[in-house]
Amino acid sequence: MRIAVEGCCHGELDKIYAALAHLERVEHVKVDLLICCGDFQAVRNVDDLECMSVPDKYKELGTFHRYYSGEVRAPVPTLFIGGNHEASNYLWELYYGGFVAPDVYYLGHSGVVKFGDLRIGGLSGIFKGNDYRKGHYERPPYTHGGEVKSAYHVRQFDVEKLKSVAEPLDVFLSHDWPRGISRYGDQAELIRKKRFLADELRDNSLGSPPAEELLHALKPRYWFSAHLHVKFAAMVRHGDERCTRFLALDKCLPRRDFMQVIDLPDKSAAGGFTLDREWLSVLRANHARHSVTRKPASAPNSAPSSIAEHRTWVERNVSDEALKPPEFVKTIEPHDAANERRRPGQGTAPRGVERNPQTVRLMEMLALDFKLDLDPGGGGGVRGGNGGGGANNFQNNFRAPPPPQHQGQGGDWTGEGGGIQRYPIPREGPFTLVPRQARGAPPPPPPPRKADDNEINLDDL
């Protein structure tokens, strides 16, 4: 199997698929699966834009609506997670995952799915301690108390479900980086590229603490991220001789490192997307604990005996044929360029939650009740940081093992990279580590900060 991994999509599906077509035409490299690491922007019409956390002047329809409407079809199966710039109303319909368009699959707020025999897990959104322990209380039109932002903040409930996964993962996806990952790669080079990150890198505050926990708990073969608009590679060697190859990529712009092709000769794409039996068992074991109010979710049920009990139910009641995900169904009308007179920023946010037939079918298959459109009011418990949801109350006691001394500068496993002038796509794999190097002296302090139009204000994310 050969996969292409892309960083931030930002609604540029046409350009990303054009890059893949160029790669196939010029270098005769054909991929079986495209993976996008967030900020996908599955925007179907101008109303969806009102549910995306972007200033009006930056709201653009992008090209996804053409794939949603059926005007064009994805030329390669595509899998993505959510980031911090998404049409949150649409992704909430598919909280457990599903097709947002034909052959374009959303992994869910958290999830595990198979493509052929490649097992892929992922976590959508970004980490903010203020919202981490809250339930999923946000609903369209996201007009109360910053809901349009908090809707994409990672929740502890989703993280703990992923910690229950015991079977090996080949690939894991997150939008923001696991905290501390820079220690396993060339941190000095990262600071050279993104000087405004220097302080967070030095005090180890850059990145997601929950993602760091998942990295060391799940130990996937590969971990792909985006968010910071820079290419960065690292190698994490775990104590049990397993290792994780980490790669973050840029956004889709000319002459930027936004895509990497990776060869997986031991994997097959045969069968396409299928649901994962262990993950279905985890969903059943934890469904009753899922809070759709402000109240924090109950502690997830991660006991192996409980997961095993639900696994037995899944084995008995879910056939192999039923593991094929439900087919894509349109739930609203797509953008109509010929008749739509409203511009981006002039839409009307939808009120309420659409019951997506894919989600309904999944709940019926698992014999679970539908919770996504329940009234979030009256949950109590977590307001303004009280009840365990505030930043000051967030405690992360996890301490990752220190990286071996040789890893500080020797984590780039992706090779020279190569590039295509308009679409800088590194050449196909497999890729090997660069020679190990001893840890050098710490990088010098950065020069005084200057205004930079490209700088990312992490506090606004």
Segments predicted by a language model, with ranges:
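Extended recognition/assembly regions associated with phosphoester-bond processing machinery
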Residues: 1-461
